Swiss-Prot record:
This is S-adenosylmethionine synthase. PANTHER family: S-ADENOSYLMETHIONINE SYNTHETASE. The keyword Magnesium applies. K(+) binds at residue 68. It comes from Drosophila melanogaster. L-methionine binds at residues 81, 124, 269, 300. Its EC number is 2.5.1.6. Binds 2 magnesium ions per subunit. The magnesium ions interact primarily with the substrate. Binds 1 potassium ion per subunit. The potassium ion interacts primarily with the substrate. One of its GO terms (cellular component) is cytosol. GO terms for biological process: determination of adult lifespan; one-carbon metabolic process; S-adenosylmethionine biosynthetic process.
Length: 408
């Protein structure tokens, strides 16, 4: 049973909700995270939704976008609410995105040239618009909905991300690189990876010791044998991506454990925007408020406040104020100020929770109108966020730790 703690207490291997799971220093535990490739049907929908968002922001930085995508065999459906001055060729944006992913022939289960693109897009509700942003100064723009958002950071990797999810993403990135370069001529766009690491619990910190299990499942042509596929993936992906120091004789590797994976993408499973929220964030570490990111402009705090919370958490860790950090913020629709801000340090900080909160309040303004300015969220940057995780990657403003004003 979870043991209740305050935000500053130690003894928690994960502490997803501020609770701890009663673990002694020196104990070891296993933790697993997964990632999905660009051609996974849900991730394909995320990319399309964010491509639509970017297309609007390129012409209208103040566009209000909430675009969901559904994918099934031979069909893409866009649905949602968009209020924008932009003139967007939805057919073109969708087809170019699908082509980039790699679905360019019906033999792969989907073809950007022949798929049917359906639209069910309305204007944003005038009631929401009136209560959130109409006739308001930028700094007074309200949250587009109620909700809770979390940001997490850990010092176990240079990226301040959990090693499990970092490695899972890197496996998928390597697969896509080899597919696009034709080294894996037989590979198709759909793939999934999963990494289990053994951790040592040390005074609230989670210290990765070794990789326990690796799972890779990837869509492939019928012209390659499973034996050859497994050998190729082992030699050119697993052994290249996973640092040798984490691999030992007991590490388990499963490559296409189900066998054949010729039928993939939307032909194998229906896809939907926002169904890979753990892949998009921390791989199960920290916590998640439930709101998805893709297809949403900055007024949707599901996205912007989650980015800001990550910025806060990473800044605290990079400043040496704690080794692990979880930040929660909450909002009410139409109100600019967050309702609550909470920080958990898992017992890894020399500061009290009150001191950490004071540092956050002194250094960060978490109103949506300030977040958009500080993180430059009106730019068309979102399609790149929609694969391999929104956090822990260079080139995004929320990954640049802020120098903090701290009273010693």
């Amino acid at each position: 049973m979870p043991q209740k703690t305050n935000g500053h207490s130690a003894n928690g291997c994960n502490g997803s909700n501020g609770n701890s799971y009663d673990m002694e220093d020196g104990a070891t535990f296993l933790f697993t995270s997964e990632s999905v490739g660009e051609g996974h049907p849900d991730k394909m929908c995320d990319q399309i939704s964010d491509a639509i968002l970017d297309a609007h922001l390129k012409q209208d930085p103040n566009a209000k976008v909430a675009c969901e995508t559904v994918a099934k065999t031979g069909m893409i459906l866009l649905c949602g609410e968009i209020t924008s001055k932009a003139v967007v060729d939805y057919q073109k944006v969708v087809r170019e995105t699908v082509q980039h992913i790699g679905y360019d022939d019906s033999s792969k289960g989907f073809d950007f040239k022949t798929c049917n693109v359906l639209l069910a897009l309305d204007q944003q509700s005038p009631e929401i618009a009136a209560g959130v942003h109409v006739n308001r100064a930028e700094e007074e723009i309200g949250a587009g909905d109620q909700g809770i958002m979390f940001g997490y950071a850990t010092d176990e990797t240079e990226e301040c991300m959990p090693l499990t999810v970092v490695l899972a993403h890197k496996l998928n990135e390597k697969i896509a690189e080899l597919r696009r370069s034709d080294v894996f001529w037989w590979a198709r766009p759909d793939s999934k990876t999963q990494v289990t690491c053994e951790y040592l619990f040390n005074q609230g910190s989670a210290v990765p010791k070794r990789v326990h299990t690796i799972v890779v499942s990837m869509q492939h042509s019928e012209k390659i044998s499973l034996e050859t596929l497994r050998s190729e993936v082992m030699e050119k992906v697993v052994k290249v991506v996973i640092p040798a120091k984490y691999i030992d004789a007991n590490t388990i590797v499963h490559i296409n454990p189900c066998g054949l994976f010729v039928i993939g993408g939307p032909m194998g499973d229906a896809g939907l925007t926002g169904r890979k929220i753990i892949v998009d964030t921390y791989g199960g570490w920290g916590a998640h408020g439930g709101g998805a990111f893709s297809g949403k402009d900055f007024t949707k705090v599901d996205r912007s406040a989650a980015y800001a919370a990550r910025w806060v958490a990473k800044s605290l860790v990079k400043a040496g104020l704690c080794k692990r950090c979880l930040v929660q913020v909450s909002y009410a629709i139409g109100l600019a100020e967050p309702l609550s801000i909470t920080v958990f340090d898992y017992g890894t900080s020399h500061k009290s929770q009150k001191e950490l909160l004071d540092i956050i309040r002194r250094n960060f303004d978490l109103r949506p109108g300030k977040i958009v300015k500080d993180l430059n969220l009106r730019q068309p940057i979102y399609q790149r966020t929609s694969t391999y995780g929104h956090f822990g990657r260079a080139g995004f403003s929320w990954e640049e730790a802020k120098p903090l004003e701290i009273d010693n």
